[in-house]
From Swiss-Prot:
SUPFAM superfamilies per record: Metallo-hydrolase/oxidoreductase
Gene3D superfamilies membership: Ribonuclease Z/Hydroxyacylglutathione hydrolase-like (3.60.15.10)
InterPro entries named in the record: Metallo-B-lactamas (IPR001279), RibonucZ/Hydroxyglut_hydro (IPR036866), UPF0173 (IPR022877), UPF0173_UPF0282_UlaG_hydrolase (IPR050114)
UniProt family annotation: Belongs to the UPF0173 family.
GO function terms (MF aspect): hydrolase activity
Swiss-Prot/TrEMBL keywords: Hydrolase
UniProt keyword Cell cycle present: no
Source species, domain of life: Bacteria
Protein name in UniProt: UPF0173 metal-dependent hydrolase STH3160
Signal peptide: none
Phylogenetic lineage: Bacteria, Bacillati, Bacillota, Clostridia, Eubacteriales
NCBIfam families, per the entry: PRK00685.1
Length: 224
């Protein structure tokens, strides 16, 4: 299984059969190395409707026929634009043909429709991948460490950009709580206000021994 970082909070997950996109902010993303037309997902997961997360969702979904997994409010807004939607809500789980999705809490605004921002735990290919979305640090993250997700998270994507989300210090605390096998920092460096030292974050995580940090540059891939 491969996880390709597309810059900001956008990721592509492929396992040889399924192709998933998360928060596909492609067009207008100065860090993204690909064009939206190059992506061919079967599913798109959207954590909230801020432009830097919903991004090219509608255009990609219309072109490929992908199903968009998002919140109820976001689903209504996207369905009105002719997109096929599977809407969910905080705390919910749902099985899809590729695996299972759990919708997790995220402390952040949602966008023009209102509703709740979220994160996702994606079960695919025998792995559990947590994309936190845009969020502050919150103590319920501890539940992902073997409580509601047993035996725990294989890969966590956590924002470290600060200002709009938690910064590297709080993200390092999140890693200690979640204790994923691998952590990939996201939502950093895209714009001047998000400039951070990802290598410093990685060093902090290594010191704690809570996870293996993997800092991906846009376009790079991590293989599970």
């Amino acid at each position: 299984m491969q996880i390709r970082y597309l810059g900001h909070s956008a990721f592509e997950i492929t396992d040889g059969k399924w192709n998933l996109l998360i928060d596909p902010f492609i067009t207008g993303n100065p860090a993204c190395p690909v064009k939206a037309e190059e992506l061919h997902p079967q599913y798109i997961l959207v954590t909230h409707l801020h432009d830097d997360h919903v991004g090219d969702t509608v255009a990609i979904a219309k072109r490929t026929g992908a199903t968009v997994i998002t919140s109820f409010e976001g689903g209504q807004a996207l369905a009105a634009q002719g997109v096929k939607v599977a809407d969910m809500a905080l705390g919910g789980k749902r099985r899809f043909d590729f695996g299972l999705v759990r919708v997790t809490l995220a402390f952040h605004g949602f966008g023009p429709t209102g509703g709740h921002a979220c994160g996702f735990v994606i079960h695919i290919g025998g792995k559990r991948i947590y994309h936190a979305g845009d969020t502050a640090l919150f103590s319920d993250m501890k539940l992902l460490n073997g409580v509601i997700e047993e035996p725990g998270i294989d890969v966590a994507m956590l924002p470290i950009g600060d200002n709009y989300t938690m910064g590297p210090e709080d993200a390092a605390v999140a890693v200690e709580w979640i204790r994923p096998k691998v952590v990939i920092p996201m939502h950093w460096g895209t714009f001047p206000v998000l400039v951070q030292d990802a290598s410093g974050f990685a060093a902090r995580v290594r010191e704690t021994g809570a996870s293996q940090p993997v800092v991906l540059r846009p376009g790079e891939t991590y293989t599970l």
